[in-house]
């Protein structure tokens, strides 16, 4: 197969994957188009809430678990999936409370309908709260709309509300939280409480006062809900620890919640087990880097608890939205493997004139393309695999995709098989080392991964050297670059002038 056909083959492969990935993302973006009927005046919407509170449709219980959704980030779909899993997991625990989603007006109606009709949530639509801290020098734009969480105080249909972030993982029922006082939260940080879960007593007056504090510029270190609420409830650290009364009575005032209601996942990674004696071990939270949230398939086995979240998803909403694309990609990659093994396309006999002064540049460029094709084989699949698929499926598809794309480089560019696949074997080994379930603690696990990576590094370097030296040998022997007029050159091959 000549140069032209080889590049056509590579172009078809990459074009198909780009089209499929773009089509999948466009299907998600179609869901993100804001409904036209929600274009209402912001000031009027907030005034209405201040006057009447947020009313849910046919409240069934006196208490509620609530979470929020808003648009405008690159990860809107992922957080929508996380919200669905949270709602479904609470339903599966048979909590005695309504499940409320505080959704901004630009959340797609299709998502709202799914939350209401399939997941059993009560969705209330709100206008985004304007964030006056967005011009702070340390402000992170992903926190721009987190002040929508303040709407929880306007849920006047309920006596108590447990406000939740979407990245909470419930291990068991926690309805005793509704016995807590007017405001209760967990101190993950010794001095700063965490707003991923807190209990509140709805009050329109408190909601009005919070909006007033926003207008006058109350101090807010991070410009998000966390900094504002820590400033607003600055005395919480001095309050007693919550212990639910055995008679079911409801407490008053402000209280600190035991750590078991907001167990930071990083504590688990130290011991690889939970051992928090103060309070029930009920809820896991995943603060930290957004790209390592548990719903991303690559978060496991890097972070072991990601698998627990995906098992909860598998038992609730499943993966039907992502599976069609996964099947298409798997069949496509399998086809690439078969075709490259049977047809063995290769770019050979790239001809040049004996007097060409740019030969060195051409050869260097060709070596660079060959090396980039190997690197791309391991990077490109990360952008095509659906982000929220189960880790076992995600990593299996990644290994298949990287193997298939590597086989194109091996057969098309005449590269040595083992050196090209050395990173593939290294990645597989890393996954097995990280997923090993019998480590005594997280320190031993981390040291094992480090030792494995240390041992693998020389093999990767040797493989890189072998690939570059092999390319140089091919060029020197004129396997890839025979001169015009040599007997091995036929008129059907491409020529460089």
From Swiss-Prot:
Which species? Arabidopsis thaliana (Mouse-ear cress)
Query: What keywords sit in the KW lines?
Result: Glycosyltransferase, Manganese, Membrane, Metal-binding, Transferase, Transmembrane, Transmembrane helix
Q: Which parts of the sequence bind Mn(2+)?
A: 165, 167
Q: What is this protein called?
A: Putative glucuronosyltransferase PGSIP8
Which molecular function terms from Gene Ontology are attached?
glycosyltransferase activity; metal ion binding
InterPro entries reported for this sequence: GNT1/Glycosyltrans_8, Nucleotide-diphossugar_trans
Membrane spanning segments where?
Answer: 3-23, 319-339, 365-385, 388-408, 418-438, 442-462
Q: What EC number(s) does its UniProt record assign?
A: 2.4.1.-
Q: Which cofactor does it need?
A: Mn(2+)
Task: Family membership, please give it.
Answer: Belongs to the glycosyltransferase 8 family. Glycogenin subfamily.
Tell me the enzyme class. Answer: transferase
The annotated site for Important for catalytic activity falls at 149
Membrane topology classification: Multi-pass membrane protein
Lineage, top-rank taxon, reads: Eukaryota
Keyword Metal-binding attached = yes
What does the entry list under GO cellular component? membrane
Locations listed in the record: Membrane
């Amino acid at each position: 197969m000549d140069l032209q056909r080889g590049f056509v083959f590579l172009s078809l492969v990459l074009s198909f994957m780009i089209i499929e990935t773009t089509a999948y993302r466009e299907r998600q973006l179609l869901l993100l188009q804001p409904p036209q009927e929600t274009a209402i005046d912001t000031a009027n919407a907030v005034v209405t809430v201040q006057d009447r509170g947020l009313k849910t449709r046919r409240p069934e219980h006196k208490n509620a678990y609530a979470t929020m959704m808003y648009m405008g980030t690159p990860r809107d779909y992922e957080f929508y999936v996380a919200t669905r899993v949270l709602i479904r997991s609470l339903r599966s625990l048979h909590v005695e409370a309504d499940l409320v989603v505080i959704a901004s007006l630009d959340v797609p109606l299709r998502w709202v309908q799914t939350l209401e009709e399939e997941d059993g949530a009560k969705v209330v639509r709100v206008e985004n709260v304007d964030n006056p801290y967005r011009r702070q020098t340390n402000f992170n734009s992903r926190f721009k709309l987190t002040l929508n969480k303040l709407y929880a105080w306007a849920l006047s249909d309920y006596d108590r509300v447990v406000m939740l972030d979407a990245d909470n993982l419930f291990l068991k029922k926690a309805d005793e939280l509704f016995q807590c006082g007017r405001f209760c939260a967990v101190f993950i940080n010794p001095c700063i409480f965490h707003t991923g879960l807190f209990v509140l007593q709805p009050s329109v007056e408190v909601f009005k006062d919070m909006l007033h504090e926003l207008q006058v510029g109350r101090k807010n270190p991070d410009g998000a809900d966390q900094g504002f609420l820590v400033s607003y409830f600055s005395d919480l650290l001095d309050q007693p620890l919550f212990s639910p009364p055995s008679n079911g009575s409801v407490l008053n005032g402000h209280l600190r919640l035991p750590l078991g209601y907001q167990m930071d996942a990083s504590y688990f990674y130290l011991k690889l087990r939970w051992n928090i004696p103060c309070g029930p071990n009920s809820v896991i939270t995943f603060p930290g880097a957004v790209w390592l949230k548990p719903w991303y398939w690559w978060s496991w086995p890097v972070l072991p608890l990601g698998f627990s979240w995906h098992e909860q998803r598998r038992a609730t909403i499943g993966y039907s939205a992502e599976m069609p694309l996964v099947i298409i990609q798997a069949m496509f990659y399998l086809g690439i493997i078969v075709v490259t093994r049977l047809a063995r396309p290769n770019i050979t006999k790239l001809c040049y004139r004996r007097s060409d002064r740019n030969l060195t540049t051409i050869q260097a460029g060709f070596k660079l393309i060959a090396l980039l094709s190997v690197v791309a084989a391991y990077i490109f699949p990360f952008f095509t695999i659906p982000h929220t698929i189960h880790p076992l499926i995600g990593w299996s598809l990644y290994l298949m995709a990287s193997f298939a794309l590597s086989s194109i480089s091996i057969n098309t560019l005449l590269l040595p098989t083992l050196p090209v696949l050395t990173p593939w074997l290294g990645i597989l080994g890393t996954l097995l080392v990280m997923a090993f379930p019998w480590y005594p603690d997280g320190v031993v696990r981390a040291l094992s991964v480090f030792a494995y990576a240390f041992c693998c590094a020389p093999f990767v370097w040797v493989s890189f050297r072998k690939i570059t030296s092999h390319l140089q040998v091919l060029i020197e022997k004129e396997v890839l670059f025979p001169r015009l007029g040599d007997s091995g050159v036929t008129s059907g091959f491409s020529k460089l002038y």
